[in-house]
């Protein structure tokens, strides 16, 4: 919608505005690579209106910075007893959502729920873990996770009973935020190999120990998450188990501290851990001149004052500001819901208000 809006402005011949540039970036959702590649001197303007927000009537003036911390466990394949009961365990139907915007909503993390049950099985039975897979995008709360396991045939029914008990427990814990949560336990064909026992123990304990969710709330803006971490994905690739986590914070030192906590838990489990360079946050400027123009415009058009907020998610604005420190900017957009999930959608009536507001701002931006 941001791209379409810019193209509409460029194509129109009846829109009043001063000198204007439109900046298009690629891969915002997967790594901010377009914004990272922006060079100093590429743009001439000193006012930027970011069109990437998700709530009409709310103007954003700050965001969190973030970085990914990745752990890799190297395992040895061992022979799986062919006379054991092989079964898959799955966590499904979770709400998911954006790991910044939705991290404060107490939604379940499929990787954590699966690991919790596998840890119970590992402690109680002669347990083999053959495969594990959960989550996908680093910036999404995982909705599904699965594992292929094996226990002695005599423990087939006890495992099913344990699953029923565990399902009732987590359904009770997440009765409000995860109404569609479901678990599945299905018989499977035998798997030739499994992950060695030592790695399984260390993997399950490390994932159990790693923090997931809100860690600290902002002391400056009520209701704003300051620091968080998301256990985004668990994948088996080329003889290794790769776990991607994502840390966010509006305070750089707190984000680094959170990343070190994650690193410590995984390194204690014997994993190799790396933390990426990350991306910067955007410190709010309530005295922004363009923000004043936007607020007055909204009041003039709709008779109410827009909400001015900061967001616990990564916007490209932090990177723009790093390259252009004098930029005066805010972020806006129509209302979107279910972002970063299969349920992603846009509330169409909000597009008209968003469009009218943008055009009025363009009219009233002071021309130097």
PLM-predicted stretches and their roles:
Residues 1-29, 87-91, 98, 105-121, ...:
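Alpha-helical metal-binding/catalytic segments enriched in His/Glu/Asp
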Residues 1-82, 130, 215-218, 222, ...:
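Acidic/histidine-rich catalytic neighborhood of metal-dependent amide-processing enzymes
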Residues 102, 109-111, 116-132, 284-327:
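Active-site-adjacent substrate-binding region
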Residues 147-148, 182-193, 230-234, 242-252, ...:
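A short beta-alpha structural unit
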Residues 219, 226-239, 302-361:
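Zn-dependent metallopeptidase/amidohydrolase metal-coordination segment
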Residues 253-272, 281:
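Redox- and metal-dependent alpha/beta enzyme cores, enriched for Fe-S-associated oxidoreductases
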